[in-house]
């Protein structure tokens, strides 16, 4: 992971602003501890903190075209960069081996309307000194975070994390996923549009399991490009186990040269985190034994988790209960992963949104409702699991890649017949995915019930969080919460506790508005609560809130 920081529409002293930009960019150096770079002129400033994974020696940023007239700062990975280099290499003189430099080639060729050509995860800021124009863009689902804000002079700031904007901006907001801002028309435009957003476009499709299986294998393989050691996050659940199995299949050869040479680090390392004796640790070890990975089991105590909560809220920049519950073990694990010399990991985020994997999907009344909920969940994922995976890992300088959210894979998986994703009546959640990959995994894992990450690390983790919140937040505080927190008013003591910490760390009203809210059961959207009368009486995002869970709340 890297970080970017940019200032545009400059109206104040550029020399002083450059100093300020360096100071604010430094707040995100945990994302990119390997190198720092800056471009500064009277009209634009671009700062970058680099985590070097591809082209370690020559890929420092900002990147420039040959004429030094186009400047680019990027946080991301472009998985189809080799194909784009081949296509544009006769018309653009590449200066580095960085995968991200293809953005400059595309801009030179097409102007601002090229973002859908990119397959990957990214957030970037590009400055064109010839036109005195800038282009800001974010990937299709917002896998990579990006925020924007304005100061009292009307100067525009962009940054990978809001902590770099809060000290200087009057207002901030999340830069929309799947969108770009081109300064010459001044509008934020959405570029990510798919036919599968509409149920009618997919309802009569025929599901091809072979195509689905191959699409995921292709996605994982493309995500393996790396010039540094990498690993896999292996919780022992279906999604991370599938990603680990496919990664193991290709890890012995370098994908960068079409598998002509041996991988520089042929032994695949896997990582699991949990309280001692937790459900995830046992299942993860079983998968690791089956696949033959070098497995690392990372333990944490409830007290260690509690001690990390404030740091987690600072790094994840949220007060969302589910996100904080799940981010804390991930944050602790990331520190150990970095200590072992690993700089990139593959993870299983996104599968539950694509395939209707959360336990509340058992209550989906029909295929149309299920499909529409999966689309809602995917388009909102930048506020939840994408933020968690990205920021919890980058807090310690580790990059998380998410093959289930690959754009090409989504175009296959979201076009299969939604009826084939329905669960209940004897069918397990994500049964179509299980059927595709059951040969890759032990049967006990291929058909293991969905366990949310915050539950799977150990049930006592969430139970203790609730107990601590009950001790620290009074009944009166919760009853009067609407006066202190009129926006996204906390509805539980746990939520109140997190919100209190968040407001201390980010004391800007618009910062709180960057965090999602609303009722949820087992990670559902507010809309899906209408599926079951019992949901309307609950307000707990744990999977144990749904009766089909084997350890459901009584």
Swiss-Prot record:
Q: Annotated site (Important for beta-aspartyl-AMP intermediate formation), which positions?
A: 349
Which Pfam families does the UniProt record give? Asn_synthase (PF00733), GATase_7 (PF13537)
Q: Quote the catalytic residue positions.
A: 2
Q: What is its EC number?
A: 6.3.5.4
Q: Which InterPro entries would you find in this protein's record?
A: Asn_synth_AEB, Asn_synthase, Asn_Synthetase, AsnB_N, GATase_2_dom, Ntn_hydrolases_N, Rossmann-like_a/b/a_fold
What pathway does the annotation place this protein in? Amino-acid biosynthesis; L-asparagine biosynthesis; L-asparagine from L-aspartate (L-Gln route): step 1/1
The positions annotated for binding ATP are 233, 273, 347-348
* Reaction equation(s) it catalyzes: L-aspartate + L-glutamine + ATP + H2O = L-asparagine + L-glutamate + AMP + diphosphate + H(+)
Q: From what superkingdom does this record's organism come?
A: Bacteria
Per UniProt, what is one GO molecular function of this protein? amino acid binding
Q: Name one GO biological process term.
A: amino acid catabolic process
Q: What does the record note about activity as a function of pH?
A: Optimum pH is 6.5-8.
Q: Which residues form the signal peptide?
A: none
Which family is this protein grouped under? Belongs to the asparagine synthetase family.
Cited function: Catalyzes the ATP-dependent conversion of aspartate into asparagine, using glutamine as a source of nitrogen. Can also use ammonia as the nitrogen source in vitro, albeit with lower efficiency. As nucleotide substrates, ATP and dATP are utilized at a similar rate in both the glutamine- and ammonia-dependent reactions, whereas GTP utilization is only 15% that of ATP, and CTP, UTP, ITP and XTP are very poor or not substrates. Also exhibits glutaminase activity.
How it assembles, according to the record, is: Homodimer.
State what protein this is by name.
Answer: Asparagine synthetase B [glutamine-hydrolyzing]
- Source species: Escherichia coli (strain K12)
């Amino acid at each position: 992971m890297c970080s970017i920081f940019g200032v545009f529409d400059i109206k104040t002293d550029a020399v002083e602003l450059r100093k300020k930009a360096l100071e604010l960019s430094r707040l995100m150096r945990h994302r990119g501890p390997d190198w720092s770079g800056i471009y500064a002129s009277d009209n634009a400033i671009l700062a970058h903190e680099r985590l070097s994974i591809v082209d370690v020696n020559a890929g420092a940023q900002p990147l420039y075209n040959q004429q030094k007239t186009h400047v680019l700062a990027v946080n991301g990975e472009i998985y189809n960069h080799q194909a784009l280099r081949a296509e544009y290499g006769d018309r653009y003189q590449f200066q580095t081996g960085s995968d991200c430099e293809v953005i400059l080639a595309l801009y030179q060729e097409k102007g601002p309307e090229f973002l859908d050509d990119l397959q990957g995860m990214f957030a970037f800021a590009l400055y064109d000194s010839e036109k005195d124009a800038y282009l800001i863009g974010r990937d299709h689902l917002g896998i990579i975070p990006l925020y924007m804000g304005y100061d009292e002079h009307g100067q525009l700031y962009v940054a990978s994390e809001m902590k770099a904007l809060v000290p200087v901006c009057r207002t901030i907001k999340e830069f929309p996923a799947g969108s770009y801002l081109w300064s010459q028309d001044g509008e934020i435009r959405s570029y990510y549009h798919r036919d599968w957003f509409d149920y009618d476009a997919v309802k009569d499709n025929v599901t091809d399991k072979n195509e689905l299986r191959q699409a995921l294998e292709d996605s994982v393989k493309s995500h393996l490009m790396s010039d540094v050691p990498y690993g896999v996050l292996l919780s022992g659940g279906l999604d991370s186990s599938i990603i680990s199995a496919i990664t193991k299949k290709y890890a012995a050869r370098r994908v960068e040269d079409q598998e002509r040479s041996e991988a520089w680090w042929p032994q695949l390392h896997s990582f699991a985190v949990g309280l001692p004796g937790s459900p995830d640790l046992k299942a993860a070890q079983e998968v690791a034994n089956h696949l033959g990975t070098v497995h690392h089991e990372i333990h944490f105590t409830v007290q260690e988790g509690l001690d990390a909560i404030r740091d987690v809220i600072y790094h994840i920049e949220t007060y969302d209960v589910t996100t904080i519950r799940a981010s804390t073990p991930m944050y602790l694990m990331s520190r150990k992963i970095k200590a072992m010399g690993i700089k990139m990991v593959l993870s299983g985020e996104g599968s539950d949104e694509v395939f209707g994997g959360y336990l509340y999907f058992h209550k989906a009344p029909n295929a149309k409702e299920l499909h529409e909920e999966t689309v809602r969940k995917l388009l909102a994922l930048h506020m939840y699991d994408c933020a968690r995976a990205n920021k919890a890992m980058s807090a310690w300088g580790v990059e998380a890649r998410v093959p289930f959210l690959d754009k090409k894979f989504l175009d296959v998986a979201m076009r299969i017949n939604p009826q084939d994703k329905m669960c209940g009546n004897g069918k397990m959640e994500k049964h179509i995915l299980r059927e595709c990959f059951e040969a890759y995994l032990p049967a006990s894992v291929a058909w293991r019930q969905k366990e949310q990450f915050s539950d799977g690390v150990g049930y006592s983790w969430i139970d203790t969080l609730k107990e601590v919140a009950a001790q620290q937040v009074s009944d009166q505080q919760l009853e009067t919460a609407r006066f202190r927190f009129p926006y996204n008013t906390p509805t539980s003591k746990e939520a109140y506790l997190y919100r209190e910490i968040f407001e201390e760390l980010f004391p800007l009203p618009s910062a709180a508005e960057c965090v999602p809210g609303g009722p949820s059961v087992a990670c559902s959207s507010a809309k899906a609560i209408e599926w079951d009368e019992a949901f309307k009486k609950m307000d707990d995002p744990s999977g144990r809130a749904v009766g089909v869970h084997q350890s459901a709340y009584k």
